[in-house]
Amino acid sequence: MPPSPLSSGAFYQRWLGPVLANDEGLDAEQLSCTALTALGQASLRRQWPLVSTVLEGLAGDLQRRDLRLEQVLFGCRFPNPVGLAAGFDKNGVAAGLWDRFGFGFAEVGTVTWHGQPGNPRPRLFRLAQEQAALNRMGFNNDGAQALRRTLERQRLAPPGRRPAVLGINVGKSKVTALEQAPEDYASSLELLAPLADYAVINVSSPNTPGLRDLQDSSQLRRLVERLRRLPACPPLLVKIAPDLEDEAIDGIARLAFEEGLAGVIAVNTSLDRLGLEQRRLLQTGRTLAEEAGGLSGAPLRQRALEVIRRLRASAGPALTLIGVGGIDSAEIAWERITAGASLIQLYTGWIFQGPELVPRILEGLQLQLDRHGLRSIAEAVGSGLPWLPGSEDAEG
């Protein structure tokens, strides 16, 4: 079998590494769109012999199979705890491929009932030195009906029989008034439920006016109760912001338990500039303090960890947590898992470091299981066990 063009990350590091190492160069959004166009075509043609051969080579490079990394959570079998966060594959064009990149699960969206263009460009900015990004995308997507058609065209295996779990992240249409939000979410979810292993209620993006008001306990409860009345509802999780006060986090944990939610995803991007207030964007000449949008990546790491710890302390092990925000190494992944996250998601770190980040994390987790004498990754969740370094670490 010929080697994958992404073998050892050589392609990514040679061609994209120099582009991503500074804030200038190719537009960040255009780069993502170009990559997704190619991946979307590959997903539609993944049964073709040549495409299949390339994808199998890719899987050989990036997948790491180990029964110790498997978990069954809210009725879904996750082959490993590392997933692709929502926001990259907004329209689900590459849903049939993400397992080849080593992911145990992938989340498409955020999708809204009405297709919408999002906010004006430029709206996505690299902060290479800080390994971070600022975005104010505004839920740009083709809409729920288009997403269903896109997923059906890829002829995915039915839920429960896929090589990687598929989540669908649902948000509110910008044109929908806040008081009508439950019906807007319900329309999307009712249409997409047959295709989803799980669904996420996104009430935490900072880029849709008023959306974060839905994190208020009374508003969120009304929304959840409406969705749970659907004829067929997949396991529901809620994605929360890092900027919530601790009392609000506790309230969401209680609500999730009382309403029977499958879990909480923590966290979305932050309105806090996290010490980067005076960092100036080359594209606009303005500082981050002057710019709208949510911050992601390494600066978010500590707050994301604190939120996971708070949720774990509030809800205990009964509520599944998915950790996202600033995860760019096996050590950080282990820290998030031992703080209470059963699963983790990557986005900004994966963009900067490339596809090899997934196997590096998985190999690092395997080594930690060995060093701690654990039989499964589930035993590490919420354990508080430290990272044990060793000479053979996958991280070097």
From Swiss-Prot:
PROSITE patterns the record matches: DHODEHASE_1 (PS00911), DHODEHASE_2 (PS00912)
Compartment list: Cell membrane
Keyword terms, alphabetized: Cell membrane, Flavoprotein, FMN, Membrane, Oxidoreductase, Pyrimidine biosynthesis
Reaction equations catalysed: (S)-dihydroorotate + a quinone = orotate + a quinol
UniProt pathway: Pyrimidine metabolism; UMP biosynthesis via de novo pathway; orotate from (S)-dihydroorotate (quinone route): step 1/1
Cofactor binding mode and count: Binds 1 FMN per subunit.
Membrane topology category: Peripheral membrane protein
CDD domains: DHOD_2_like
Its EC number(s): 1.3.5.2
Assigned GO CC terms: cytoplasm; plasma membrane
GO MF, one example: dihydroorotate dehydrogenase (quinone) activity
Disulfide bond positions: none
A Pfam family annotated for this UniProt entry: DHO_dh
Chief location category: membrane
Active-site positions on this chain: 205 (nucleophile)
Binding-site residues, substrate: 90, 135-139, 202, 207, 268-269
Entry's family note: Belongs to the dihydroorotate dehydrogenase family. Type 2 subfamily.
Subunit structure: Monomer.
Protein name according to UniProt: Dihydroorotate dehydrogenase (quinone)
Organism from which the protein derives: Parasynechococcus marenigrum (strain WH8102)
